Amino acid sequence: MLTAAFLGTMVGCGVPAKQTNEELLYDAFVYTLPLVVFDATMKKSTNTVTVTDQQAPVNQLFHAKNLATAEFKDVVTPNVDTVYSQCFFDLSEDGLILELPKTERFCVVEVMDAFTNAISIIDTASFEKDTERFLFVKSDFSGQTPDGIKKIECPTAKGWILIRTICNDAEDIVNVRAIQEKMDSYTLMQYVSGNTEEKPEGVYDPNNNFIPVQYVQGLSMQAYFDKANQLLKDNPPTKDDEKTVKSIARINVGPSLTFDSAIFGDGAETLWKELMGSVAKKCLQSSQAYMMKNGCWSYYGAPIAEFGTAYAYRALISLVGLGANPVSVAVYPKAEYDSDGVRLSGDQQYVLHFEKDELPPVQENGFWSVTAYDSSNNFLMDNAIDRYCINDRSEVVYNEDGSLDIYIQSEPPADELRGNWLPVSAEQFHLILRIYLPEGSVVANEWPTPSIAKK
């Protein structure tokens, strides 16, 4: 017979202790959360009969016609210097062809699987031809790829195409729309039959008219894992996930399994609410190795968008920045505190200061912007002048020494400095400094970030 002391010695010597059901529940939730958030986002975004500027039936593109404002609630932390084009696809019955024009500006396509991993990045400015076509298929596709079309395999049946096209100002929107009009999507069968113009109608369900993250947060434990298990069946995990999938199967979470919240007893829903309320904080703690810190700023570094088995990191991003790019395309330094370590507050006034020659370094067609968000919900803040960011195209006034000051406050500064004003209104807010197509010094965290000083 093994004594308790001996068992303790075994654990201390590296024999792993068996996980409790509560620990497995956390692992299962973290593993499946991006999949469930993606599914909710897809349901909301395809909940329409015909194409609009915010929704389209499955496998069809829809294009935002304007930059995001405070009314935009579909995706957290929306950027306000690119216009989105999107397509939520389902490859379970047929492949999907995406048709794109060559551009002379930043117009980058991020293709994600159902777990929100970026499986392909397409830069339209790099095209050799005026039009390029891409065929998206499941990994087990055995059909023919038409000549002149590039095949991209997706490990899951469902996925998300997110296209960001830079828009310099309100007058530039007409040029962005001209680019959007040259984009198209249609099934492989439609292409082969020469019937690419037909766009099947979708279905509207009033029950799918929700804010995705809030919808997921409102699910019961049973409803959540019923949905997760079905999604795992439709979008099977990869071989890299085998260890985790085998582990969480012990509480019947996995493809073709039947979950029963009764295994957690009468306190199941209390446990679930506690988990829902703490998961973002726990995932952030687990992801510190990927957090790059520089001055009062920090940003999500690699492997963002190319998560591999960094499940807690992937879950965190699904809550705070769904659809984020890999660092090769963009980095997003975030500031919640000023340079003295004090929490940013809407009742204070701040100066964000770039030294001369220390504006964010970017590659050709790259750009940068500073955007403010309400920390209570990660959305833009309403303001009287409808200004949500300052960017490298803004009409700002530089200091005599060539440095740049951005004034972050609720009330406007002096008239001559209003072009440098970024309005804020929330009790607590944070800033995101987006840098698209960053130079290597940014990716390597060697570029000096701007200071944020209280006035």
Spans of features found by a protein language model:
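Sec-dependent N-terminal signal peptides
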Residues: 1-7
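A compositional/structural signature for long, glycine/proline-rich flexible linkers
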Residues: 15-455
